[in-house]
Amino acid sequence: MRKRVSFLTRSLGSDALISDREVLVEWVRARRGREADLITFQIEGSLMPQIEAGINTPCAGGKFYQDRLISSLFGIEGRTITAELGCNIPPLLKDAEDLASIQKDLWFAFPAPREIGLCNRFYHDSDEAIYALYSVYREMMRSMRDKGISGHILHCDNPVSEELEALAGRRVFFFSHIETKKTLEILLEYQATVAVRSSALGLIEDLMDEYDVQKIILIDSREDDLHRALEIKDAEHLICGGYCQDSCDFYWKSMVENASVIR
């Protein structure tokens, strides 16, 4: 007998969506007396549609959060490192506290270290500079977890082995927007869960003989994609995932509605 197979849903974050002026004014009025800025508005706006849609593992933030990261860094002028790197932690802690008070078991997304594009004019060489940035990232993420954030999703286009070795772990997940055999191999070398679109399922199947692929987060999956994924992994090892770029109210609701198939 055929039955419905349902999948858990997981967010990998969202792009920043600017609502009309009236929505922003109303939001500011509701927060009167509480410290906030446009980034606060954007991260809350990225989260609320996920909660309303019933995403199992929501995630605030996205690539746009790099503006907060950059403004919080010590030792830079523009995007150039000119002194020892450090971080002004309180703005990040405020974001973490605000969001953790809205949603438990919440993850947070922002760009991986190399994606923010810093140039080095202080450290002896580029390796010393990037490892100093890794240290700052560890401090930022640990501090946010101490305030209630469950974990972080680091977005990248081209994952780098040294970066995953330094940062990937149970509470830090790397998501690559470019899916090639090489990028997937680098990811799977350090994490047993991978997020891909359906077009990369063939690559994943080929790599399963070499790597321990425990779970697949299938991005923007349709019914045919889920049936295809079920040919290579059992349902409990598949998750419907998404990264919203537009019309997030509809996007997340649609993802939840389509997170099942008849089999």
Model-derived features with residue positions:
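Domain-level signal for soluble alpha/beta catalytic cores
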Residues: 1-263
